[in-house]
Design a protein with these regions (language model features):
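S-adenosylmethionine/decaboxylated-SAM
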Residues: 1-180
Length: 180
């Protein structure tokens, strides 16, 4: 809700990257992009980067269509999912958006460790399935911290896949009520 992740992603993305953030207006963590937030978040872009802010439910077909228009046929190199923390919600975000990721690209999920008070929702349950289904998973966990954590999935490379090339360094966030 505060834009910290968007700022950090803009700092590490390619100079020409397109960064797209999807956020549900009025979500449980104050989501959406008010005019003042839009000005601030767009100022995160550096060099020739472009930041697109989409107010919408990541599960709505119209939201996905808006993303596709902005991508204009380009694949996503890095997809960060930190939205609907229900099992069904995070699974749907993964199923709807991971097919848009380039071969050799990465998908990152936030809050993959079960929190004793339930703060991380059920992302951890879906992460356990992904660890079984994908050989290239990696958990990034802070020792001694309950819950949270990042789960990284490296998608298999195809014959045309390359490392985060500048001509297609696209980042997206399917973040329902939590992020940006």
């Amino acid at each position: 809700a505060a834009g910290g992740t968007l700022l950090l992603l803009a700092r590490v993305a390619a100079p020409e990257a397109l960064l797209v953030s999807i956020d549900l207006r009025g979500g449980g963590y104050g989501g959406g992009y008010s005019p003042w937030r839009r000005r601030i978040y767009r100022a995160f872009a550096r060099e020739r980067q472009r930041i697109v802010l989409i107010d919408g439910d990541s599960h709505a077909p119209a939201t996905r269509e808006r993303l596709l228009r902005h991508l204009a046929g380009r694949p996503i190199d890095f997809l960060f999912i930190d939205g609907d923390h229900s099992y069904a919600g995070v699974r749907r975000d993964f199923e709807d958006y991971s097919p848009l990721v380039a071969p050799g690209g990465q998908v990152c999920l936030h809050d993959i460790r079960q929190h004793p008070l339930g703060y991380s929702g059920e992302v951890w349950r879906f992460w356990q399935e992904l660890e079984t289904d994908f050989a290239g998973t990696r958990a990034i966990l802070e020792p001694g911290v309950a819950g949270y954590g990042l789960g990284l999935i490296g998608l298999p490379e195809g014959p045309s896949a390359g490392a985060l090339r500048a001509d297609r360094a696209v980042l997206a966030s399917a973040s329902l009520p939590i992020l940006f």
